[in-house]
Amino acid sequence: MFQSLIAIDYGKARIGIASGQMITKTATPIGTVEAYDGVPNWIELDKIIKRWNPSDIIIGLPLDTQNFETDITKSAKDFAKEVQQRYQRKVHLINEAYSTREARWRLEEFKSKKISHIKVDALAACVILETWMSEN
């Protein structure tokens, strides 16, 4: 059974992180972890995983609008394998199409005074997690 969950919006410069749980099927943005050409700051990610101790990790898979792989898809898959090996958690991949667009829309809708990349990436991770929870 799922306990707490972590979702990751993988990116080459930043990785958005959200937490959630299946009972209420709600997600909350945690923040972002810096990445350097797709390699995350593992020390920061280690701290987040240790603190939240998720049973499962959901990672957004960047596909195009027709569900074809993009230039970053392979990097995201490699990252997912590394996350699974590093944390020994079940990792689920889910199409993240439109998650960033949805995150930007939510920030604009709620009149967020400053739409920063940090807010967008963490909120995109929420969208990924909410989508996964609604399908499982």
UniProtKB/Swiss-Prot annotation:
Sorted alphabetically, the keyword list is: Cytoplasm, Hydrolase, Nuclease, Ribosome biogenesis
Q: Which GO biological process categories is it annotated with?
A: rRNA 5'-end processing
Q: Which InterPro entries match?
A: RNaseH-like_sf, YqgF, YqgF/RNaseH-like_dom, YqgF/RNaseH-like_dom_sf
Which superkingdom does the taxonomy of this entry point to? Bacteria
One Gene Ontology molecular-function label: nuclease activity
EC number of this enzyme: 3.1.-.-
Question: Is Nuclease tagged as a keyword?
Answer: yes
Mind telling me which SMART domains this protein's record contains? YqgFc
Q: Which Gene3D superfamilies match?
A: YqgF/RNase H-like domain
- Family matches, as SUPFAM superfamilies: Ribonuclease H-like
Q: Which GO terms describe its cellular component?
A: cytosol
Location of this chain's protein in the cell: Cytoplasm
Entry's HAMAP family? Answer: Nuclease_YqgF
What is the stated purpose of this protein? Could be a nuclease involved in processing of the 5'-end of pre-16S rRNA.
Query: What is stated as this protein's family in its record?
Result: Belongs to the YqgF nuclease family.
Could you identify this protein by its name? Putative pre-16S rRNA nuclease
Q: Which organism is it from?
A: Francisella tularensis subsp. mediasiatica (strain FSC147)
